[in-house]
């Protein structure tokens, strides 16, 4: 069986050439297309441990932030604006994992709330279970912290991980995030 943590997907953006007439309708703005690539990764034992910690910290932070939002709303009838930085002092183990992964947890929770308020049929955000949740996290490219060279990818805190690169991304593709 294949673990969910052994898959990696890229979200890249690809611009179009100047000969495309749709670009001239918006002068100075290139047309962008989001493309996702999915590659299998082969982490070392040490990297598997850090991936497991990251999955756990993301799940823990999501649940903690959701619980705090619920409790604050019950007390004050106002929405709490909490960030991952607020939790790092109380829970020092959160400093061991990628900070952008924790920042994306906050964004995912905010999106869940927006979806709920936009359409209540979507349902209130739910707590994440250790046994029934998908082991994944998302990190963003900031100042070249994620690189792809040959059959390897460098991720924050994990360093270089070998991967099965079964196809080449488009030439003018920019890496935006990794999940």
Regions found by a protein language model. Give the residues of each.
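Nucleic-acid substrate recognition interfaces
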Residues: 1-179
């Amino acid at each position: 069986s294949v673990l969910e943590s052994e898959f990696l997907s890229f979200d890249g953006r690809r611009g179009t050439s100047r000969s495309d007439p749709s670009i001239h309708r918006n002068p100075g703005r290139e047309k962008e297309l989001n493309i996702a690539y999915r590659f299998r990764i082969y982490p070392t034992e040490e990297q598997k441990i850090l991936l497991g910690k990251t999955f756990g910290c993301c799940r823990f932070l999501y649940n903690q932030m959701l619980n705090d939002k619920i409790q604050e709303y019950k007390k004050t009838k106002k929405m709490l604006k909490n960030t991952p930085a607020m939790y790092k002092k109380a829970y020092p183990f959160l400093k061991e994992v990628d900070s952008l992964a924790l920042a994306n947890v906050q964004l995912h929770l905010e999106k869940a709330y927006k979806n709920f308020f936009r359409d209540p049929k979507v349902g209130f955000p739910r707590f994440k279970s250790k046994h029934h949740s998908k082991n994944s996290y998302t990190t963003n490219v900031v100042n070249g912290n994620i690189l792809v060279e040959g059959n390897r990818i460098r991720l924050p805190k994990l360093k270089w991980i070998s991967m099965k690169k079964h196809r080449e991304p488009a030439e003018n593709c920019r890496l935006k995030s990794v999940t």
